[in-house]
Amino acid sequence: MHILKLPWFGHKAENKQIECYSVSINSDGSRLASGGLDGNVKIWDTKSILHFKNYEAEPATLNNKNGINLDTLNSDIIRRPLCSMSRHNGVVTSVKFSPDGRFLASGSDDKIVLIWEKDEEQANRPKQFGEAEADLEHWTVRKRLVAHDNDIQDICWSPDGSLLVTVGLDRSIIIWNGLTFERIKRYDIHQSMVKGIVFDPANKFFATASDDRSVRIFRYYRKLSESSINNYEFQMEHIVIDPFKKSPLTSYFRRMSWSPDGQHIAVPNATNGPVTSVAIINRTNWGTDISLIGHEAPCEVCCFSPRLFEYDDSNDSQKNKNGMGNFTTILATAGQDQNLVVWTTRQSKPLVVAHDIVSGSITDMCWAPDGQTLYFSCLDGSITCVSFEDNELGKVVSENMNDLQLHRYGADRESATFPESVEQLLLEEKSEVTEHKENKKLAITKPPTTILKSRPEEVRPKEVSPKINNLTPKQVNKLTQSITITKNGKKRVAPLLVSSSSKISVPVLGTSGKVTKKFQIGSKLSQTSYFLPRLGVSTSVQGLKSKNLVHEFNQTNEANNDDQDNDNEDMGIDSAKVNDNPKDALNQSVSDATLRRQRNKIKRAILETRYPSCFQLISTLPDNLFNNQAILNSKVNQILNNNFNSKRENNNEIISGSSIDAIDEDLIFSVIVTGIQSIEDRSSIIINDAYDANTSITSIVEVRNGPSWKVNEDDITDFEYGDRIDFQDPTRVIVSNDQNHTKRSYTVFFPYKVQHVLPIIKNRILTFYVLASFNGTIQIISAKSGKYVTASMEVGNNVILLKQEGDYLMCVTNQGLIFVWKLPNLPVERFLTGVVRGISLAPILNNMVEVPSIEKKNLNKRHANIPQLMMPNVRKLDVDTRNGSPLAILEDNNEVYKFSLDLMVWIKVVDPWYFLALTDSPVDSFKTGNCIDSLLHKSYKSFEEDVKRSKIGLYIYNNSEETNELQKVMEARFKQSIELAGQIA
């Protein structure tokens, strides 16, 4: 190990050392960036620094006071920074290179983040005014990110460089796009200053550390429903609190590090009992069973080596089954005790402990890409390089092995594929089992002051410590209820709200204290942190008083609402509630907007289940109920194909996350009005000469659905117990006509909501009304008197379609089940007869399901194809009036199916492939004399439209023997299939 402390390697001004706060190295290890108290960002050449690693000075050849042999040094060694940038107006607290090394992000206490990029065109520019020496490289500012309200403490890039996260003393977590540097999200979730940020090398999580004594882990992934660059979704995965309950608040940084294999997070400034420690968070369960103990003062920075190391232990009999050997990771920790400690996961004791290696607190560290060179900055202004010899830490494994270790967490798959897929969970579960087996050999006896080892594999009952009674009695608020005695001697006890005695203020819905987030376009744009006077720059002195007045006015009228420019609602955080109750901050109070979003998500899932999109064309329900995410592809296809001669208008609203509120089933079906024209039934009365059999009667059915019934007694808050009624606003069905209101006017009550009303007309005479509820209850009543014709029938699911065809009634549920009954012929018949009992449409629909596959070469592409379930729509359902068997025609391929009552299976009546042979023979020549003819014409008409849109290609018959034979065979087969379909019942 070599420790290089070069006198010119650091921040200084006028021969005085200036505090250095941050260092970062680029992806190829050729450039090192540093930032310090002087407000400068300096770029160093690592080759010039590492040259001194192999230098051995001899006393006879020392030519200067620093003991450096100038004769043996190469002329290309640069003993100063390549460039020094001074664009910040404050202390540079953090610098970070992007993963590809193109950009350099620097944060300062001037609340601004600068994005630097090397300018090759001005590499050899002359010395500028005020500079001691000309820069050898030129870095220019590409972006200026303004969003923080206080000092910026830490910066981190995502492993793929697509995201940039900055944290600061304003307790904000701001997420930027790593390409366009637009602000994506801002979260003010922490309750104190945020001092550390680190990304998961598997590109699934990032973690933040704060002075609120917590570490919060966030999961992020791409949204599938959006095509924007900023299509990321962020969720809080876990909160780690236990190791930091007594952590001191004197540290300026809490710089964490994630291990290169993705298994552990090292978090500084933790405590284990009375001593300071470094907490190790396990990725599998976010547990903190391991603590690194040894630092005498709070630790401020941790840094894992970016490479895995392989060691060969001849005494270890256990090897990996795959023969890949044993891997270990290297961790460096430092802090206020001025000591550098290097740990390894191979053993419990540290590898290296360098006491008083510097004369100030160590503020930041970074490893070179080779994993064997460490740079760290210090408050004494110096930057120190620690270089290890080959195989001193272990044998460095290839970077491909790093990627292989991250595969178990889905590092090779795009985050947009599945945020938490079953495959990924299985991989993590397998990795846990392998990890436990390999860690059995590391069960070394724990030294008393070095490390606290994790819990053993065997689950033992915990020792229960005796509870000590607290001598301080708890304050109990005695609750009293008001009791009144009525005139008849009965007691009435007024209910008492228990939460009213609590000191914690609970926001009440509908009060003026409710904080609502107002959307402003400017809230998503970068804004300067400097205040401009209201009346102009020239009146800045006069404008100060106006500023203070405005500030006092805002404090009076907008208390606890100083900063609403955040996206806490996405995480389920309500800023107003957290400010009112800081103690509940860790419990994550859920905001009203989040509850509404979760309710809409559940509501959307319910709508997609109750109203499948494949039944939209056949249903009589409103179209907007079917406009869910599953039919977006169908809508796009209809638009692109221009859908010639389509009589169905596609003016429906596509449902999004915000417009789902507009769909309310209770409101849509609160009132249902149906009008029917029929003739009067005179079969039971004497017909006089003045009677006209063609006189039409208009009957009106009005359904008034009542409110939803309360399931629990606690849900009914609008009534006192003494004033309640058991039967509240039932559903009313009012029937009337325009001929004689007194003769045919009645009201029927139902204890459920009615969704469908179907009048049954036989021989132009109104006979029955069929009513269907939301839950699949079907009731048939007499059109004359409202008398029940049959008992209530339950089909199990909500009804999509009710249809009458002759003497048959067909019902289709959202599960694709078809029921057909034969209606009675009054007065000879009185009861229904079942024809088809719950046959499924799945055999003909699932036959056309398409699940596109993902090729391996497209896995890493941003816009890779995502598997989607493509189910064809049902164009029409009909009933064979001869025997009641259902018929169906599909939209995509125009196939016609019929359910055979004899065979008890779906049979294909029309195969559109045979239409290709009907060049000269019109489809009118094929007739069966029943309802199949109409479906045949519809199928052929759709086939012709597909041909016009070039969706289907035609066969070209060139009058050769082969083509003529094919055409004749196809025509014959088509004719046979039509005839068989007409004969089979």
UniProtKB/Swiss-Prot annotation:
<dbReference type="InterPro" id="IPR001680">
    <property type="entry name" value="WD40_rpt"/>
</dbReference>
<dbReference type="GO" id="GO:0031491">
    <property type="term" value="F:nucleosome binding"/>
</dbReference>
<dbReference type="GO" id="GO:1905268">
    <property type="term" value="P:negative regulation of chromatin organization"/>
</dbReference>
<protein>
    <recommendedName>
        <fullName>Protein HIR1</fullName>
    </recommendedName>
</protein>
<keyword id="KW-0539">Nucleus</keyword>
<dbReference type="Pfam" id="PF09453">
    <property type="entry name" value="HIRA_B"/>
</dbReference>
<dbReference type="InterPro" id="IPR031120">
    <property type="entry name" value="HIR1-like"/>
</dbReference>
<dbReference type="InterPro" id="IPR019015">
    <property type="entry name" value="HIRA_B_motif"/>
</dbReference>
<dbReference type="InterPro" id="IPR015943">
    <property type="entry name" value="WD40/YVTN_repeat-like_dom_sf"/>
</dbReference>
<dbReference type="InterPro" id="IPR055410">
    <property type="entry name" value="CAF1B_HIR1_beta-prop"/>
</dbReference>
<feature type="repeat" description="WD 2">
    <location>
        <begin position="87"/>
        <end position="126"/>
    </location>
</feature>
<comment type="function">
    <text>Required for replication-independent chromatin assembly and for the periodic repression of histone gene transcription during the cell cycle.</text>
</comment>
<dbReference type="GO" id="GO:0006368">
    <property type="term" value="P:transcription elongation by RNA polymerase II"/>
</dbReference>
<dbReference type="GO" id="GO:0000122">
    <property type="term" value="P:negative regulation of transcription by RNA polymerase II"/>
</dbReference>
<dbReference type="GO" id="GO:0005634">
    <property type="term" value="C:nucleus"/>
</dbReference>
<dbReference type="GO" id="GO:0003677">
    <property type="term" value="F:DNA binding"/>
</dbReference>
<feature type="repeat" description="WD 4">
    <location>
        <begin position="189"/>
        <end position="228"/>
    </location>
</feature>
<keyword id="KW-0156">Chromatin regulator</keyword>
<keyword id="KW-0805">Transcription regulation</keyword>
<dbReference type="GO" id="GO:0016480">
    <property type="term" value="P:negative regulation of transcription by RNA polymerase III"/>
</dbReference>
<keyword id="KW-0677">Repeat</keyword>
<dbReference type="InterPro" id="IPR011494">
    <property type="entry name" value="HIRA-like_C"/>
</dbReference>
<dbReference type="Pfam" id="PF24105">
    <property type="entry name" value="Beta-prop_CAF1B_HIR1"/>
</dbReference>
<keyword id="KW-0804">Transcription</keyword>
<feature type="compositionally biased region" description="Acidic residues">
    <location>
        <begin position="560"/>
        <end position="572"/>
    </location>
</feature>
<dbReference type="GO" id="GO:0042802">
    <property type="term" value="F:identical protein binding"/>
</dbReference>
<feature type="region of interest" description="Disordered">
    <location>
        <begin position="556"/>
        <end position="587"/>
    </location>
</feature>
<dbReference type="InterPro" id="IPR036322">
    <property type="entry name" value="WD40_repeat_dom_sf"/>
</dbReference>
<keyword id="KW-0853">WD repeat</keyword>
<dbReference type="GO" id="GO:0000785">
    <property type="term" value="C:chromatin"/>
</dbReference>
<dbReference type="GO" id="GO:0000417">
    <property type="term" value="C:HIR complex"/>
</dbReference>
<dbReference type="InterPro" id="IPR019775">
    <property type="entry name" value="WD40_repeat_CS"/>
</dbReference>
<feature type="repeat" description="WD 3">
    <location>
        <begin position="147"/>
        <end position="186"/>
    </location>
</feature>
<dbReference type="GO" id="GO:0000775">
    <property type="term" value="C:chromosome, centromeric region"/>
</dbReference>
<feature type="repeat" description="WD 5">
    <location>
        <begin position="248"/>
        <end position="291"/>
    </location>
</feature>
<keyword id="KW-0678">Repressor</keyword>
<dbReference type="Pfam" id="PF07569">
    <property type="entry name" value="Hira"/>
</dbReference>
<comment type="similarity">
    <text>Belongs to the WD repeat HIR1 family.</text>
</comment>
<dbReference type="GO" id="GO:0003714">
    <property type="term" value="F:transcription corepressor activity"/>
</dbReference>
<feature type="repeat" description="WD 7">
    <location>
        <begin position="357"/>
        <end position="398"/>
    </location>
</feature>
<dbReference type="GO" id="GO:0006334">
    <property type="term" value="P:nucleosome assembly"/>
</dbReference>
<feature type="repeat" description="WD 1">
    <location>
        <begin position="13"/>
        <end position="54"/>
    </location>
</feature>
